[in-house]
Regions:
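Bacterial Sec-dependent N-terminal signal peptides
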Residues: 1-22
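Juxtamembrane/interface motifs at transmembrane-helix termini
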Residues: 6, 81-82, 298
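Residues embedded in well-ordered secondary-structure elements
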Residues: 6-8, 52, 132-134, 238-240, ...
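Secondary-structure boundary elements
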Residues: 21-98, 104-107
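Hydrophobic/aromatic-rich core segments of domains that either
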Residues: 104-184
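Alpha-helical and coiled-coil interaction segments, frequently adjacent to or embedded
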Residues: 136, 155-157, 166-319
């Protein structure tokens, strides 16, 4: 019975991911057709994007698609935690933003479309150097939107992460549209984002309850959302193990397609090892594998699923 339940849950997650793509095909196509909308002000852009749609979710999606394809990530300002140019008109004119700039513009456009939207400030981990290294200052922002009147009808949207990702040093930005940061999975979002105000942790008590708990978790990359990982083990970001003892990993997945490869990469961006292919099992959507590390060392460890880094750990191996 337990196996059947897991298969059913996996089916529902797969169906949900597929349904989302179909549901937002129209606003995505509309925003893509409009292009950059150069020389238009914020109000005109918001109206042009949302006018064809009556449903607030589709309006919000059109805004999300347009922003993630037409606003670039401001690396210098983000690295310096400089948020002086976050006003919506400045972001639209310069076509670049910090995470708070993305969130502020999204909130402004949503309000113009009569969608209730609030900006949430908080924390993310961008690399394994952040694990167990509690940040003193807020380093990220996202939004929550309300489509109904109940607490369960608030949804996460992260337009900055949806546009792409940076390297560890925040020197390079890779555009990489991630659909799944729109109405993001609340459980996974709570593992990868920590709000400054706990009232905006929408997944409830399943997520980390303190900053210390949050910074003790693994790093979850954009591909964790596209893969739909859940029930991750181990859920501690810093792993200690012996050379003679295998380390076991497992997670659920909600991807539509079958996973064909899993690999481990040791080392940071500057000195990564060659990917080490894993023998893994897929039992009703539960991916499991293990690896025995052969020498004493401490290093970042990346889990790569079908060629994309999904999550990262720090690992310490002793004899």
């Amino acid at each position: 019975m337990k196996f059947i339940s897991l298969v059913f849950v996996s089916f529902l997650l797969n169906y949900s991911a597929s349904a989302q793509k179909k549901e937002y095909a129209a606003p995505d196509a509309h925003a893509a057709r409009l292009g950059a909308l150069i020389s238009l002000n914020v109000a005109t852009i918001a109206d042009t994007l949302t006018r064809p749609f009556e449903d607030n979710a589709q309006k919000a999606r059109a805004i999300y698609y347009w922003m993630t394809h037409n606003i670039s990530f401001d690396l210098k300002a983000t690295k310096g935690n400089d948020n002086k140019n976050i006003k919506p008109e400045i972001v639209v004119n310069t076509r670049k933003a910090t995470p708070l700039g993305y969130a502020t513009l999204f909130q402004e456009m949503s309000s113009m479309a009569n969608i209730r939207c609030l900006t949430v400030d908080g924390y993310v981990k961008r690399s394994t150097s952040d694990i167990n290294n509690i940040a003193d200052e807020i380093n990220h922002s996202w939004v929550v939107v309300q489509l109904g009147k109940t607490p369960t009808e608030w949804y996460y949207i992260d337009p900055a992460n949806g546009a792409g990702y940076t390297d560890e040093a925040i020197k390079n930005f890779t555009p990489d549209f991630t659909s799944e940061y729109f109405f993001a999975n609340k459980t996974l979002f709570d593992l990868s984002h920590f709000p400054d105000n706990m009232a905006w942790q929408l997944g409830g008590t399943k997520g980390p309850q303190t900053k210390k708990d949050f910074f003790g978790l693994p790093v979850f990359c954009n591909s964790a959302f596209t893969t739909g990982v859940g029930n991750i083990k181990p859920l501690t970001g810093y792993i200690k193990a012996k050379t003679k003892t295998p380390v076991f990993f497992s997670f659920n997945t909600s991807t539509d397609s079958t996973i064909s490869s899993i690999a481990l990469i040791a080392g940071d961006d500057r000195h990564p090892s060659a990917p080490v292919p894993m023998n893994f099992t897929n039992n009703g959507g539960i991916i499991s594998f293990s690896y025995q590390f052969k020498r004493e060392d401490s290093f970042p460890l990346r889990i790569v699923v079908d060629g994309k880094v999904v999550m990262e750990y720090m690992i310490e191996i002793t004899e």
